[in-house]
């Protein structure tokens, strides 16, 4: 019986597991899922938790709900992978494998910017998101209760205006109103900045749609500064350079969304193949020269035949990678991995957004926001099952 070990219960890991459940139940394979936490969390909803608009429990799924007969779950942190001995070492266990699936997710990347890792909070996981939400409210409370009002306490700087940054800024539109009402603060005093070194906003959308997103945020009091090279961070500021001029923006809440990398364990395990925690896989998502090891999700840099660059790491491609690997390990004739890009949606809070989905269908406003929720509901179903999706309130 083939012994399959899956590292990580993210999108790719759980879709791999779902594809193996039938074979595991039939006793054709033995599956072990290893994850640091007892839960899976929806990375695509971390921005909502970070703003404080929803509790973290709303985006978490207990792993015990997805473990079925023939599947074992080990809650522990992976510290080493020995590819020669075919062993996974965690803090407590040694786990042998015949087939290994590595889906250990992403880590923040600050590109060596001075003070960034020490001072800015990344939207990296559930605990990080909860910290941002708590810091944001603590600072508003501090402003409201202090005799000497310091506007930096009700100021927020977001480094990065990619999808993660823009969606977080969209959530802040609602949260700002809520906190100002709660603590009796004039909304006009609040300063929120979205910074990016890029000259354009959301290049995956048409200019009409990216302009729509920018206008929505700016109409709600958020300042977008493009072409802003972020040079450093202090405990209460970002140092930026715009058109050759350096300036310091002050804020007590500093958030970083401008960079991610794959898991550092990738560089340690495959030093000659991995760069910034990502490994260029074969067309079957395996490690070159190691057909028994699959790389999926944020750790995988998949370059399709005929292309020059890897696809961006998204939940969409992670789900497709997991489904492919689960099918391939089960012995189904799947051929090479082919990614189907079904489009992109950017929410701007829970009532607005922009969307450009498969077939060139575009929408904006409330319709796009609802489309995002429908896509999220479908993703949870693909990861688990209908009952679990209902339990986690992802079916609308």
Language-model segments: what does each one mean?
Residues 1-72, 166-204:
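Beta1-alpha1 glycine-rich phosphate/pyrophosphate-binding loop at the start
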Residues 350-396:
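C-terminal auxiliary extensions adjacent to catalytic cores
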Residues 73-80, 174-282:
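A Rossmann-like FAD-binding core segment of flavoenzymes
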Residues 12, 105-108, 169, 260-262:
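Short glycine-rich anion-binding loops that position phosphate/pyrophosphate groups of nucleotides
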């Amino acid at each position: 019986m083939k012994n399959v070990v899956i590292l990580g219960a993210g999108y790719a890991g759980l879709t791999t597991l779902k594809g193996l459940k039938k074979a595991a139940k039939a006793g054709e394979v033995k599956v072990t899922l290893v994850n640091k936490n007892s839960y899976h969390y929806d990375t695509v909803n971390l921005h909502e938790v970070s703003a404080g608009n929803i509790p973290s429990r709303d985006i978490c799924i207990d792993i015990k709900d997805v473990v079925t007969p023939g599947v074992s779950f080990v809650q522990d942190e992976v510290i080493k992978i020995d590819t020669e001995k075919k062993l996974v070492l965690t803090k407590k266990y040694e786990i042998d494998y015949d087939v290994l699936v590595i889906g250990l997710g992403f880590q923040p990347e600050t590109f060596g910017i001075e003070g960034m890792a020490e001072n800015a909070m990344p939207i990296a996981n559930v605990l990080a998101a909860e910290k941002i939400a708590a810091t944001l409210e603590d600072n508003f409370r501090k402003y409201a209760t202090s005799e000497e009002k310091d506007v930096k306490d009700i100021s927020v700087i977001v480094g990065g205006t990619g999808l993660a940054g823009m969606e977080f800024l969209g959530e802040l539109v609602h949260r700002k109103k809520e906190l100002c009402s709660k603590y009796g603060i004039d909304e006009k005093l609040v300063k929120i900045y979205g910074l990016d070194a890029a000259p354009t906003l959301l290049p995956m959308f048409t200019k009409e749609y990216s302009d729509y997103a920018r206008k929505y945020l700016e109409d709600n009091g958020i300042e977008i500064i493009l072409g802003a090279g972020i040079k450093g961070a202090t405990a209460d500021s970002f140092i930026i350079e715009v058109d050759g001029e350096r300036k310091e923006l002050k804020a007590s809440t500093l958030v970083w969304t401008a960079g991610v990398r794959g898991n550092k364990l990738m560089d340690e395990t495959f030093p000659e193949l991995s760069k910034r925690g990502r490994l260029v896989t074969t067309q079957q998502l395996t490690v070159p020269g190691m057909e028994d090891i699959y790389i999926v999700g944020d750790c995988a840099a998949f370059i399709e035949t005929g292309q020059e660059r890897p696809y961006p790491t998204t939940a969409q491609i992670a789900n497709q990678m997991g489904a492919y690997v689960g099918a391939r390990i089960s012995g189904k004739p799947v051929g090479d991995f082919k990614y189907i890009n079904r489009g992109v949606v950017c929410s701007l809070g829970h009532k607005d957004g922009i969307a450009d989905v498969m077939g060139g269908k575009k929408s904006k406003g409330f319709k796009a926001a609802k489309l995002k929720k429908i896509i999220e509901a479908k993703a949870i179903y693909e990861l688990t099952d209908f009952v679990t999706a209902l339990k986690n309130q992802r079916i609308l």
